[in-house]
């Protein structure tokens, strides 16, 4: 599977889809891509991990950094479609104390 990011703007929200690995090999590229994507709207952002095969600690750091970026504009970040293993890792990292998990993105 190719490692890439795609996004859609649905109504007032931005949905970002991560494909392949979310690991240290791709974080620099993804960080700059995400900054541009997040600037395209004012509403909530959903990170959809349904096509993500692997997430390491740098991937969690990337998510946390984008959360902080959105907080400056009083915007919310939601996480969606995590695998059971990834869900557990995000839970142990305390991510759900900062952002909400949703089973799927509606809209």
Where are these regions (language model features)?
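Short beta-strand/loop segment at the start of cytosolic alpha/beta domains
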Residues: 1-17
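Inter-domain helical "communication" segments and dimerization helices
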Residues: 6-9, 40, 107
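Amphipathic alpha-helical interaction surfaces in cytosolic regulatory modules
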Residues: 22-98
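Short acidic-hydrophobic, aromatic-tinged amphipathic segments that line or gate anion-handling sites
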Residues: 100-104
């Amino acid at each position: 599977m190719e490692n890439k990011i795609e996004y859609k703007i649905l109504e007032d929200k931005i949905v970002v889809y991560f494909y392949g690995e979310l690991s240290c090999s791709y974080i620099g590229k993804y960080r700059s891509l995400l900054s541009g994507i997040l600037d395209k709207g004012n509403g909530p952002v959903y990170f959809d991990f349904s096509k993500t095969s692997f997430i390491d600690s740098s991937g969690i750091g990337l998510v946390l950094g984008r959360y902080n970026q959105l907080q400056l504009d009083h915007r919310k970040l939601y996480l969606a479609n995590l695998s059971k293993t990834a869900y557990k890792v995000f839970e142990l990292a305390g991510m759900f104390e900062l952002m909400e998990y949703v089973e799927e993105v509606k809209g």
